Amino acid sequence: MKEALKKIADQIPYPIGKLLGKTPMSLRLGHDYQTFNKLTNASFLSLRNSQLEQINKLIQFSRHETVFYRDHLKEKGYNHKSIEAFEDIPSIPITRKSDFQRYTLDERSVRRLALKKSNTGGTTGQPLDFYLEKTAYAREWAHMHAIWATLGYRYTDEKITIRGKNIGNRFYKYNFNQNEFLINAYAPLQENLDACRELITKRNIRWIHGYPSSVYSFLRELESVDALLFEILISKIQGVFLGSEYPAPQYRNYIEQHCGLKSISWYGHSEMAVLAPEREPGSGVYYPFHSYGYAEAVPDGDSYRLVATSTHNFATPFIRYDTGDLIDPTFKDGLLECFRIKEGRNSDSVIDKNGRSISLTGLIFGRHHQAFDHSEHVQVRQPAPGKIEILVTSKENRESWAELFDFSNAFFDVSFTQLESPVRTPLGKVQLLLR
């Protein structure tokens, strides 16, 4: 039923879809949606107790039902039958993507509990297939709606969604399941201005949702092409939901300060082991949902690694799974309370002439380069250690971009290339570091 809804959701005409869109989420996603919706508001103590209980169940189940965990736990010398407290969890061996990749999907999974196959890691060069559990959609959307509700969102509200979905030659199409208008991120706005004007003026759009880079590109292009239409849209919008990418300061400053819009971001990943929204919109501090999974900050030299357990997925268990992200954590009573992303799983860093790993967040966004006043996007490519190529997307014709960047005291040979449009992934994301 849930999969069928997804397949037909963007084929139903707006007038019919608008009526269907009023159907309560509990009827679309079943009783599980209500259950998770209640869990998002459960008491801290009950959620912590539930986490411990679920982790115990997951370990025993995985050890008996999957070849991978039977081997993995034995190989690491873990033979405890149960854990009594959170202090016992660090004794459970950490699992990395490379560990999973040594085994087939069937050896890591219990197929009878699966809803569908999913995958992750396409941009990191480490693909991994896994199964989502049958309650995955209910779990995901109950928590996503809880995040958006902090800005006032209701599921009957209309929104624009700007990501990388291929919708053919159309500028937009309606998807009743999320009551959203999917914008074609690849379609030139100038050539589709009439369709854009019809959408903005005739529909009651209250929210924008999408990749930060895509939302930024759309709003900036609209402002340059039709300033009046831009103002009309901004006057309607109550907030912006920034997902699937790290919201780079350049993008967020434009959305919040220039456009005057509230925004909220969250940390999540395809494996669905941890979901952590901002409690204070715009803060960049993420608080994991205890009703979604169990998140830890595990020391790694001078840093901490984000490790997570998907407490609800018994189809392909993820137990103490290394997400690949480095974080700056805050602890409460010895447990992870919240965190900032220090270095992402996509390893957005480059190697300088001295062989040191340099964070691109600081190198590009921490130096207040004047180039940001003259460009739409800045991306980086590293052809060799000590060398970086700066790719600038701009409508200005400049002979030299070097004077607008400050790379003083940085040990790199820097070259510059100007582009008409940014380099995007197959899904339409604009990544800072190109590989």
Annotate each PLM feature:
Residues 179, 262, 379, 413-415:
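Conserved beta-strand segments of alpha/beta enzyme cores
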